[in-house]
Amino acid sequence: MQIKAEEISQIIKDQIGDYETSVDLNETGTVISVGDGIARIYGVQNCMAMELLEFPSGIMGLALNLEEDNVGCAVLGSVQGIKEGDIVKRTGKIAEVPVGPAMSGRVVDGLGKPIDGQGPINSDLTSKIEVVAPGVIARKGVHEPCYTGAKAVDAMTPVGRGQRELVIGDRQIGKTALCVDAIIAQKNTDVHCIYVAVGQKKSTVALVVEALRKHGAMEYTTVVAACASDPAPMQYIAPFAGCSMGEYYRDNGQHALIIYDDLSKQAVAYRELSLLLRRPPGREAYPGDIFFNHSRLLERASKVNDELGAGSLTALPIIETQAGDVSAFIPTNVISITDGQVYLEPNLFFSGVRPAVNIGLSVSRVGGSAQCKAMKQVAGTLRLDLAQYRELAAFAAFGSDLDVSTQAKLTRGERLVEILKQPQYQPLPMEKQVTILYAGSTGHLDSLPIGSLAAYEADLYDYLEANEPSVFTDLVAEQAFTDGIKEKLNKALTSFGETFKAIKGLK
């Protein structure tokens, strides 16, 4: 068989013509050691800080230490399938999470991947987990209230939109309960909520999600869960991921509320990471930049100015203390970063005062700016009455014969403490809060036994809704106690008080 030269040259030309010159160019590195959730990688020369790196098994890593001859990478998953010599690819992307309305009602991990079994999240919007906080010029003073639904908090230590209010206290005294109630209280408002669970048991997170779902709050809430069994890097980045989700609403002229539950466990996760990366330890073995870690997270909560849409991101970080020690390293750090704190005390909790807010140690640095006029009108006398009550109660314990004015102050104080108690999952709107506080501070409760006040409060709301609904609607419209509202309310309180005493057989 004779092969013609022309045919051969034609075949070669065809092959050259069909040849695709695409080059798959990847910058890769090699794993030189792996263990305890940290991989050391050689060769990724142009790697950026906080860049995502991809391991052969599809697991992602986060570049934290950029050293001369290697990169210290936190593995965001199990290290079981990673071994020395594995090829690692650069993604060229800084760690980011999906954001936007599609996240509402979902439970996700620290990278924004769904873990609730409800299918993938269809969101084209993403945001970097590390974003610089708005500058001074971009901000506006906090001036709108963000109601938590808890009478003790909204009256004494009010939270405004764009504020950072720390919730601090020992374990198991209602910190999470207070914050979950704050989420439920946003039900009929335009506030989107993000709940970040760090280092919690999965069963605890499931209970919170179930409570939110039961009260119709999951519709506007995103839960970011980095549980106790998740790797330390996931627990470290979860609050930043949740913050990015909240910032989407703030930057689009909307309002968001984020709960960090809790930052003590995030600090422990960051300490673990830092020590494994051989960073020098400082006080209590925390790294030197632990303060910066918390401040750059909490500074992202802000109220932005009108030119940027007047949106806000309000933060309620939680810190767990050991035996009430608020002078430990992490509590003092976060107290100094935030705009006030709500201090929950075990003694109050176990004596039946729930929420167990210690009014003396709790403070809001925004104060009256975050309250409507109606709340200011009742809260001013309330704080004074309670302060006098606490002072007199200490002395009254030693003597039995008290003069009439002292006895009156003690009577008033006992009733005010009682009406500040509130059951879990029952946050109150502003108009109901100011109504019962007004009744307490004007003496309408002084003649009632303490044990009957819970029933009095519940029946009072029903009575007003049935017989004087204009009191609530006027309070919402005016946001203040006008002479007309006071007159109507005083009349209703007197009438209801007589009816209540008659029904309960009280004198």
UniProtKB/Swiss-Prot annotation:
Membrane topology annotation: Peripheral membrane protein
Recorded GO MF terms: ADP binding; ATP binding; proton-transporting ATP synthase activity, rotational mechanism
EC number assigned by the record: 7.1.2.2
Residues that coordinate or bind ATP: G169, D170, R171, Q172, I173, G174, K175, T176
Pfam families the record matches: ATP-synt_ab (PF00006), ATP-synt_ab_C (PF00306), ATP-synt_ab_N (PF02874)
InterPro entries linked: ATP_synth_asu-like_sf, ATP_synth_asu_C, ATP_synth_asu_C_sf, ATP_synth_F1_a_nt-bd_dom, ATP_synth_F1_asu, ATPase_a/bsu_AS, ATPase_F1/V1/A1_a/bsu_N, ATPase_F1/V1/A1_a/bsu_N_sf
Alphabetic keyword roster: ATP synthesis, ATP-binding, Cell inner membrane, Cell membrane, CF(1), Hydrogen ion transport, Ion transport, Membrane, Nucleotide-binding, Translocase, Transport
PROSITE patterns attached to this UniProt entry: ATPASE_ALPHA_BETA
Gene3D superfamilies: 2.40.30.20, ATP synthase alpha/beta chain, C-terminal domain, P-loop containing nucleotide triphosphate hydrolases
Top-level class of the enzyme under EC nomenclature: translocase
Site keyed Required for activity: positions: S362
Primary localisation category: membrane
Subcellular location: Cell inner membrane
Keyword Translocase recorded: yes
Zinc is among the record's keywords: no
One GO CC annotation: plasma membrane
Recorded catalytic activity of this chain's protein: ATP + H2O + 4 H(+)(in) = ADP + phosphate + 5 H(+)(out)
HAMAP family: ATP_synth_alpha_bact
PANTHER family found in the cross-reference section: ATP SYNTHASE SUBUNIT ALPHA, MITOCHONDRIAL (PTHR48082:SF2)
Stated family: Belongs to the ATPase alpha/beta chains family.
Quaternary structure, from the entry: F-type ATPases have 2 components, CF(1) - the catalytic core - and CF(0) - the membrane proton channel. CF(1) has five subunits: alpha(3), beta(3), gamma(1), delta(1), epsilon(1). CF(0) has three main subunits: a(1), b(2) and c(9-12). The alpha and beta chains form an alternating ring which encloses part of the gamma chain. CF(1) is attached to CF(0) by a central stalk formed by the gamma and epsilon chains, while a peripheral stalk is formed by the delta and b chains.
Function noted in UniProt: Produces ATP from ADP in the presence of a proton gradient across the membrane. The alpha chain is a regulatory subunit.
Name used for this protein in its record: ATP synthase subunit alpha
Organism: Desulfotalea psychrophila (strain LSv54 / DSM 12343)
Gene: atpA
